[in-house]
Amino acid sequence: MVINDIESLTAQALADVAAAQNLDHLEFLRVALLGKNGSITLQLKQLGKLPVEQRKAIGEKLNRVRDLISAALMDRKAALESAALSKRLIDERVDVTLPGRRGERGGLHPVTRTLERITEIFARLGYELVEGPEIEDDWHNFEALNFPLHHPARAMHDTFYFGDGRLLRTHTSGVQVRYMSDHRPPLRMIAAGKVYRSDSDQTHSPMFHQIEGLLLDKHATFVDLKGTLSEFLRAFFERDFEVRFRPSYFPFVEPGAEVDIAWQQSDSSVRWLEVLGCGMVHPNVLKNVGIDSECYTGFAFGLGVERFAMLRYGVDDLRAFFENDVRFLRQFS
């Protein structure tokens, strides 16, 4: 080893460092020069093999070279980092004189809008909004509502059961059972929320929203029921149309009825549309919640919120409400 070799190595190392174009290349040079097996490090390891009289001078020379190269590496790294930052600032610069971008405005889902509209109308009629659990037991969902264990009417409801016998409620009527058990007549209430049935097509969903109403008082009659629902339908659709009540069967009411409206279609023709079910509360239901059916009578009704949303907004396929397509939902914002 001679000093000229060290000087030549130093000159080449400094030239390579100055020519480095990126941080990765610079790190490669640092390892090649000053790393564990770098050329400068290997020179320092060879000092022990030199004659004693040469070690001090060459050792001092190598240490100065190492410090010089280290300083050059640090300076070049700072220069490359500064250049990279400047480029990034240019690439990501924002012209503050340009007009700003408006934030996306959200809006209520059409089902939520419909649900709120219905509950608001019934609130004006004096009905209290009540909520209840979506996971029910057989008593509140079926038996208390005059669905005995082997009653054929249970086949009307395609039910999701849990292993312990509980179930996802098939209607919000269970909320009425709980409310009647805790309150004494007279009372007016509506129960709103999600219900679940194993059914899915253009007009049915495994999960949908339902509102059921209940009125109990002395001398409540079917005429009161007809007047209440006729007033609600006219308030919701904001139009007058013919309403008819057809006899129908529901285990928890007697007599029961389906409610149809004379709906004017886009071609100006009129057809009857079924919109909800109703009836006078069955005496067995009152008995199951400890209310004297000889003293009190009442009526109940139920409707699908999505059905009303489809009619109000002209939607043909119920499934569109649950697909979360922003293009569809933006129409109602």
UniProtKB/Swiss-Prot annotation:
Keywords carried by this UniProt record: Aminoacyl-tRNA synthetase, ATP-binding, Cytoplasm, Ligase, Magnesium, Metal-binding, Nucleotide-binding, Protein biosynthesis
Per its UniProt record, the required cofactor names are:
Mg(2+)
* Recorded catalytic activity of this chain's protein: tRNA(Phe) + L-phenylalanine + ATP = L-phenylalanyl-tRNA(Phe) + AMP + diphosphate + H(+)
Please state the Enzyme Commission number of this protein.
6.1.1.20
**Where is this protein primarily located?**
cytoplasm
Question: Residues that bind Mg(2+), according to the entry?
Answer: 254
Enumerate the GO terms in the molecular function aspect: ATP binding; magnesium ion binding; phenylalanine-tRNA ligase activity; tRNA binding
Subcellular localization, per the record?
Cytoplasm
Cofactor note as given: Binds 2 magnesium ions per tetramer.
**Single Gene Ontology BP annotation:** phenylalanyl-tRNA aminoacylation
What Gene3D superfamilies does its record include? Answer: Bira Bifunctional Protein, Domain 2 (3.30.930.10)
SUPFAM superfamilies on file: Class II aaRS and biotin synthetases, tRNA-binding arm
Q: Give the GO cellular component terms, alphabetically.
A: cytoplasm
- InterPro entries for this protein: aa-tRNA-synth_II, aa-tRNA-synth_II/BPL/LPL, Phe-tRNA-synth_IIc_asu, Phe-tRNA_ligase_II_N, Phe_tRNA_ligase_alpha1_bac, Phenylalanyl-tRNA_Synthase, tRNA-bd_arm
According to the UniProt entry, where is the signal peptide? none
Enzyme class label: ligase
Instruction: Spell out the family assignment given in the record's similarity comment.
Output: Belongs to the class-II aminoacyl-tRNA synthetase family. Phe-tRNA synthetase alpha subunit type 1 subfamily.
| Complex and partners | Tetramer of two alpha and two beta subunits.
Q: NCBIfam families annotated for this entry?
A: pheS
Q: What is this protein called?
A: Phenylalanine--tRNA ligase alpha subunit
Species: Xylella fastidiosa (strain M12)
